[in-house]
Structure formats: structure tokens, C-alpha cells
Regions:
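Class I S-adenosyl-L-methionine-dependent methyltransferase catalytic core
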Residues: 1-161
């Protein structure tokens, strides 16, 4: 399920499967603490939970999106492993610098380069998954492990140096 009347772009099945297969190949999900920032429907965080993550925090500033996240968590039987937070992404990262193992970063495609820089500087994670309409320059603090284009979507996996 996706939030109604919203310009949400749920990650396609093929992109999601390839992304999570890459995370699985690194052993990154088993027992992991995951942050699904710009959660939308929660599909990415729910996929992480279904593949062995111990906990996922879903952050979005749209209450309708968060209602959908809660419904999707309930429908999959994963509600006990999910924490749903209404907040603007950068404000959340500034207030709660809790370290996570994997951060799933799928902001709106209109997200600019400066916003990406701020986001990557603020997130406290070992690995990040970046989803965008273009290749993102991650800066010197990160090492890109994998980057692949799927039509209009570019997904990169990066590790903190």
C-alpha cells in the first residue's frame, strides 16, 4: 500500500530485490538496526525486517504516509519490530543521532546536491542505501561499494570510511 494523493514513488520490486540481495551478500541485515528515512509506504524498512533486521525506525513528515507504514507493518506481522516517527528527516537526524547499522535514504527526486551533503553528514550509519534520479557524490567520508541505474532510478550502496 502507498500513501494516497501523495507524490510518493514506491521503490519498484526489481530495484528493491536487487538492493536487498546486495545487502544480504554483505551480511548487513541479520540483527541490524535499520533507519528508513523518507519512509513513504515503509516498503524498504519492511523488506529489511523481513530479511532479518532486528528493528527498523520509519521516519516521514507526512502523517498519511505514516498511517500507511503502520498498516503495512501490521499486515506483515512486523509491527513489534518497527518504530514509526513523524519528523522532517534532517531535524530527526539532528535530534536523535542514534547509530544504526543500515540507513535507507530515499528522499524526493527534487532533493538537491547540498541537501544530500547535509543528509550524508548527519546520518550515523555504517552502511547507507541512496536512491535518487541521478548519481550522488558521497564525499570523502564514504566509499561507494555498488552503484547501479534501473531506468530513471540510481541506487548506490556506500560504507562509512
Amino acid at each position: 500500500m502507498a500513501p494516497p494523493g501523495r507524490s510518493t514513488r514506491p521503490t519498484g520490486d526489481r530495484v528493491r530485490e536487487a538492493t536487498f540481495n546486495a545487502l544480504d551478500s554483505l551480511g548487513a541485515l541479520r540483527g541490524a538496526e535499520v533507519l528508513d528515512l523518507f519512509a513513504g509506504s515503509g516498503a524498504l524498512g519492511i523488506e529489511a525486517l523481513s530479511r532479518g533486521a532486528s528493528r527498523a525506525t520509519f521516519v516521514d513528515d507526512d502523517p498519511r504516509a505514516l498511517d500507511v507504514v503502520r498498516a503495512n507493518l501490521a499486515a506483515t506481522g512486523l509491527a513489534a519490530s518497527g518504530w514509526v516517527v513523524r519528523a522532517e528527516a534532517l531535524r530527526y537526524l539532528g535530534e536523535d543521532r542514534k547509530r544504526v547499522d543500515v540507513a535507507l535514504l530515499d528522499p524526493p527526486y527534487r532533493f538537491g546536491n547540498e541537501a544530500w551533503e547535509g543528509l550524508l553528514a548527519a546520518v550515523d550509519a555504517e552502511l547507507v542505501v541512496l536512491e535518487s534520479d541521478r548519481t550522488i557524490e558521497v564525499g570523502p567520508g564514504w566509499e561507494v561499494l555498488r552503484s547501479k541505474r534501473y531506468g530513471a532510478t540510481v541506487v548506490a550502496l556506500a560504507r562509512r570510511r
